[in-house]
Design a protein with these regions (language model features):
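A short glycine-rich, hydrophobically flanked beta-strand micro-motif that places a catalytic Asp/Glu
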Residues: 87-93, 158-159
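Helix-start/capping segments and mature chain N-termini
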Residues: 1-75, 96-159
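Short secondary-structure junctions
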Residues: 79-88, 152-154
């Protein structure tokens, strides 16, 4: 089974546009959702869509992309998922750093992590670093820092 290369896709003018890393605007991640897709098949995709839509509405309220725009973005992302291979798409709502800039939608088509039959866990003993534990996305950097520290201690993941 092949693994497609990573892609960054920005939603602009009703379509997904491929971005290079150098084209990324500085932004704060407000909400995200990701899932495993194997050969074009995903379990509970509608639940991922609903969780993302709920997070978007909670994060930006009246400024949220209206439902038809969010639905069009979601449909375009699903259509962009390769029919073959192991991918781990992630959808994102971002707030640009530039003053007055509107929130933006982005997708990342990433290779899926390797399957494992076991892994080593490390327990985090400090305070919970998350600021919004009920939302997926805003605390992603904090969670990556925990995982990186756990990996430095010989574990695979932090809990």
């Amino acid at each position: 089974m092949s693994t497609p290369a990573a892609l960054i896709l920005q939603w602009r003018d009703g379509a997904l546009q491929v971005l290079e890393d150098c084209d990324l605007e500085p932004a704060v991640l407000l909400a995200a959702d990701s899932w495993l897709t194997l050969d074009g098949r995903t379990r509970a995709l509608e639940l991922h869509r609903q969780r993302f839509a709920d997070a978007v509405a909670e994060q930006v309220g009246a400024d949220a992309p209206f439902p038809a725009e969010l639905d069009a973005f979601w449909g375009a992302v699903v259509d962009a998922i390769p029919a073959e291979g192991r991918v781990f798409p992630r959808v994102e709502l971002l707030s640009p750093i530039a003053p007055g800039a509107a929130p933006m939608l982005r997708a990342r088509m990433r290779p899926a992590p390797e399957e494992r039959v076991s892994l080593v866990l490390a327990t985090h003993h400090g305070d919970d670093p998350r600021t919004r534990p009920e939302l997926k996305g805003p605390d992603l950097d904090a969670m990556i820092r925990l995982r990186t520290a756990a990996q430095g201690a010989g574990a695979d993941e932090a809990v």
